[in-house]
Amino acid sequence: MSFFRRKKLPSAIKPGVTFGRLLIKRVDSDGLTMLAGHLAYVSLLSLVPLVTVVFALFAAFPMFSDISVQLKSFIFSNFMPAAGNVIQSYLEQFVANSNKMTAVGTCGLIVTALLLISSVDSVLNTIWRSKNKRPIVFSFAVYWMVLTLGPLLVGASMAISSYLLSLNWLAQSGVNSLVDQVLRIFPLILSWISFWLLYCIVPTVRVPPKDALIGALVAGVLFELGKKGFALYITMFPSYQLIYGVLAVIPILFLWVYWSWCIVLLGAEITVTIGEYRDYRQQKAEQQAQPPEGQL
């Protein structure tokens, strides 16, 4: 019957449908959920070493002594919803215990923390299907720079923000209210910039900055929405607490880390698909511009 015949899509939604098909094809081909599971496992293995190294860096700089407390609160309240307080208390105990380790054990912690950065590098290059390899020395330098300079830059930005908020002339001029509004969306801005840098710098192929900006924005928005949705799910449907009791924090943390990596990798897939869609449109335009064979 004519009702069941395939209808032509409206021209206004054709680009979106085509882009969606390309994206779904890439996500299925790359095995996004499997890659996210791999990164979630490595993240849980590297979590304590990574936190230990980061806060050891803050301890080495007295200027960051007050900022480290603010940074802990910011990370656990904005990036680990619902169970953030419980996870924070456990991690602080683990970090305190790691301070008693020998030099060999400390080197092991650093290597484990670098393992996470190396895994992220490998997975993103898998998504970009890049076969280019960086020299080992250069890769180690990049990983070490991310591990050391990244936390210090975040700490410096928070120190500057705290200093500006403490100035009297800002409070009198009414700029404080504007700064408060900016600070409310600061987690989204920070996620957006972080994802953009991740998509631009880590792949060993050239990534158009505009494409990475769009993919990072989608990932940042999904991350914020996912954070609120996950916190709502944990509070409204406390099945994990009922089943696991005190140990509920373990599956909750694993589920959140896995969901976070799914969002990050989806942003990477969107970034790649934007370039593929551009090439698809260009090839289609070239085919339409060529005259039929009978008219040659």
Curated annotation (Swiss-Prot):
InterPro entries: UPF0761_bac (IPR023679), Virul_fac_BrkB (IPR017039). It is found in: Cell inner membrane. It comes from the Bacteria. The keyword Iron does not apply. Its main location: membrane. This is UPF0761 membrane protein Spro_4878. Keywords: Cell inner membrane, Cell membrane, Membrane, Transmembrane, Transmembrane helix. It comes from Serratia proteamaculans (strain 568). It is a multi-pass membrane protein. The chain crosses the membrane at residues 44-64, 67-87, 104-124, 136-156, 185-205, 212-232, 246-266. It holds the Pfam family Virul_fac_BrkB. One of its GO terms (cellular component) is plasma membrane. The keyword Protein transport does not apply. Belongs to the UPF0761 family. PANTHER family: INNER MEMBRANE PROTEIN YHJD (PTHR30213), UPF0761 MEMBRANE PROTEIN YIHY (PTHR30213:SF0).
